[in-house]
Design a protein with these regions (language model features):
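Generic structural signal for residues in well-ordered beta-strands
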Residues: 1, 93-95, 222
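Conserved FAD/dinucleotide-binding core of flavoprotein oxidoreductases
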Residues: 58-72, 76-81, 117-119, 160-231
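Glycine-rich FAD pyrophosphate-binding loop
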Residues: 1-15
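FAD-binding beta-loop-beta segment adjacent to the flavin cofactor pocket
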Residues: 232-245
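Short, low-complexity Ser/Thr-rich regulatory SLiMs
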Residues: 103-104, 184-186, 239
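Conserved N-terminal helical subregion
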Residues: 21-138, 143-156, 203-207
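Catalytic P-loop NTPase motifs of RecA-like helicase/translocase cores
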Residues: 10-11, 133-134, 232
């Protein structure tokens, strides 16, 4: 296989967290994921559901989905990308490639790139995000992302920043127009936090102002979760592709 990347490099900067299902870990273990430094990943055993006031509602036992060959796992995205780059992608990724057009010739898919190069393949999988131009090329139809009416705020914190939640588990805190997901990403007591907030406009309001008018308005005791370096992204969606070639 070959991966054509539209960017010039892989972003290996320290990133936020990612959750991997037990089955995805089972597959990754086939290329050595189980040999990754144990300090760089975590195996939460439960998903705890809370009200906005941090009163526990119920929990889901994630260990029931585990097997001897795969456990539900959390870690930093950057650690996962580095692992994939070393184990899988080092000789299989070509950068700075953007699709100009495609055509089927004698059962093969011919890909023509903007830089004038081309390739013939049996299968083509497009996975370049909501702002994908490749999807428009394949469908021969313009796809314009639309604002979903929500934003995502992300940060990382230490377990010292929480007291009424179980830092060993995944925590889902549900408010009226927002929810928070908090989970450990390694053995060093680092936690990933993502907060999804309904917001009608995508105006660049200060993050603190958005939080004060939404999630913190319902529970000021959550302030400690947002003392770190906060990053905000508006959430976009786009129409689903319908063509298979």
């Amino acid at each position: 296989f070959v991966i054509y990347e539209k960017g010039e490099i892989l972003n290996l900067d320290e990133g936020f967290g990612i959750q991997l299902s037990a089955y995805s870990v089972f597959i990754l273990n086939k290329i050595g994921f189980n040999q990754l430094n144990k300090n760089e990943k975590y195996h939460p055993s439960k998903l705890d559901f809370y009200s906005i006031n941090c009163n526990k509602i119920c929990d889901l036992d994630l260990s029931k989905f585990n097997s001897t060959n795969g456990k539900y796992t959390t870690l930093k995205r950057s650690i996962l990308i580095k692992f994939l780059k070393e184990k899988l992608l080092s000789n299989s990724i070509i950068f700075h490639k953007k699709i100009h057009d495609i055509e089927q010739i004698n059962g093969k898919i011919n890909i023509n790139f903007i830089d004038g190069s081309s390739d013939k393949v049996d299968y083509l999988v497009v996975s370049d995000g909501v702002f994908s131009n490749s999807k428009s090329v394949i469908e021969k139809k313009i796809f314009k992302p639309s604002y979903y009416g929500a934003i995502a705020i992300r940060t990382q914190i230490k377990t010292q920043g929480i007291s009424n939640l179980n830092s060993n588990n995944i925590s889902l805190i549900m408010g009226s127009d927002a929810h928070l997901v908090l989970y450990p990403i390694n053995q060093r007591k680092e936690l990933n936090l993502v907060c999804i907030i309904r917001k009608k406009s995508k105006d660049n309001d200060p993050i603190k102002t958005i939080l004060e008018n939404t999630i913190l308005k319902e529970n000021k005791n959550l302030t400690n979760l947002f003392r770190g370096d906060l990053k905000l992204w508006p959430i976009y969606t786009t129409g689903k592709p319908i063509k298979s070639i």
